[in-house]
């Protein structure tokens, strides 16, 4: 059984897209202004390794600004777009989709300082992650409170703020609780500003460079722990690999993702005990294409059931009536997501368990 200890954590654009309701079809003057600003034509900017992260991020930021503008009827800057519905398991838009957290996203113009307020969650995982225009990650916020966000602590005028809130996607009551927590998130600024792309990128050239770095990650086996972080914490090559393979990904201090490739389709078990996380862990089963199948494909530590020894025995396939059962099929594989891993994971004193298979 093949096991990869860390895979890239990607924040795909489609992951955070929200479907427009009928009222969002009405285009306001403010929305028109936003769309016009982010699509203004400028002379083509020469793409280099040094500005590749900027190119990818500016195009993604612009997409979000337009989406947020359409949904919130604002100029798309300085306001949250909340994802509140559980992902559709049949939707084949995002590969290896995350069923553990709901997302709240905002693009910030820090020409003026912003204030972020995160509510008390009573122990529920909620984290704020920042991505700058050059795709660096200046900091994370993991506790309730009020925080000042400015160019000094971000190192960039424009940043994307991504807030993840833990949820049990199968429980309508829990989805409602998370929705209420999302509504308590607050962003305030004297002037929300606007977002204007400072460059006109040649998209085919950007895609060509993206493919180049995607090839490098396969050749050099660069892991996600080497790709993300503050400016100066990664090499330029590793940084660009992260941009191309896992845009918006988190550092290993925030999450790690052991990946399991079972040797066959027989029933199997994975026994977890004392998983070294400050937040929570989860398991999601996928097919070879990265999609979920069946009815039971996700479990996390908030609703998994331990045995009398405090162990969580995850049952893959076999008897559907046992605790912690997950469906399997031809070509199945799974990811163990560990949010906010502790030192025991990194120093090796806690070992990722082996899958026991018939």
Name each region found by the language model:
Residues 15-17:
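C-terminal motif of bacterial Sec signal peptides marking the signal peptidase cleavage site
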Residues 19-21:
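Bacterial signal peptide processing site
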Residues 2-9:
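Sec-dependent signal peptide recognition
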Residues 26-358:
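A compositional/structural signature for long, glycine/proline-rich flexible linkers
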């Amino acid at each position: 059984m093949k096991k990869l200890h860390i895979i890239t954590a990607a924040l795909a654009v489609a992951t955070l897209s929200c479907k427009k309701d009928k009222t969002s079809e009405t285009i306001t003057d403010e929305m028109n202004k936003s769309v016009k600003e982010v699509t203004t034509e400028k002379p083509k900017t020469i793409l280099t390794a040094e500005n590749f992260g900027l190119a990818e991020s500016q195009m993604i930021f612009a997409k979000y600004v337009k989406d947020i503008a359409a949904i919130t009827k604002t100029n798309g800057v300085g306001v949250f777009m909340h994802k509140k519905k559980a992902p559709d398991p049949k939707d084949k838009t995002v590969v290896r989709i995350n069923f553990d957290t709901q997302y709240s996203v905002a693009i910030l113009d820090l020409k003026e300082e912003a204030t972020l307020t995160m509510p008390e969650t009573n122990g529920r995982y909620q984290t704020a992650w920042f991505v700058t225009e050059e795709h660096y990650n200046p900091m994370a916020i993991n506790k309730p409170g009020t925080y000042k966000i400015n160019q000094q602590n971000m190192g960039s005028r424009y940043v994307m703020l991504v807030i993840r809130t833990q949820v049990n996607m199968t429980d309508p009551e829990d989805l409602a609780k998370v929705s209420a927590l999302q509504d308590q998130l607050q962003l305030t600024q004297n002037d929300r500003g606007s977002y204007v792309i400072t460059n006109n990128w040649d998209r085919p050239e950007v895609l060509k460079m993206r493919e180049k770095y995607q090839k490098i990650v396969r050749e050099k086996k660069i892991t996600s722990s080497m790709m993300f972080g503050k400016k100066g914490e990664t090499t330029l090559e590793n940084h660009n690999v992260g941009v191309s393979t896992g845009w918006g990904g988190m550092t290993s201090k925030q999450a790690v993702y052991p990946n399991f490739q079972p040797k066959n389709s027989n029933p199997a078990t994975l026994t977890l005990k004392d998983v070294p996380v400050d937040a929570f862990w989860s398991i999601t089963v996928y097919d070879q294409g990265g999609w979920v199948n069946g009815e039971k494909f996700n479990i996390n530590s908030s609703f998994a059931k331990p045995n009398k020894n405090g162990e969580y025995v995850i049952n893959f396939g076999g008897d559907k009536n046992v605790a912690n059962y997950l469906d399997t099929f031809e070509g199945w594989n799974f990811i163990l997501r560990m949010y906010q891993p502790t030192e025991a994971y990194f120093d090796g004193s806690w070992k990722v368990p082996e899958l026991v298979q018939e």
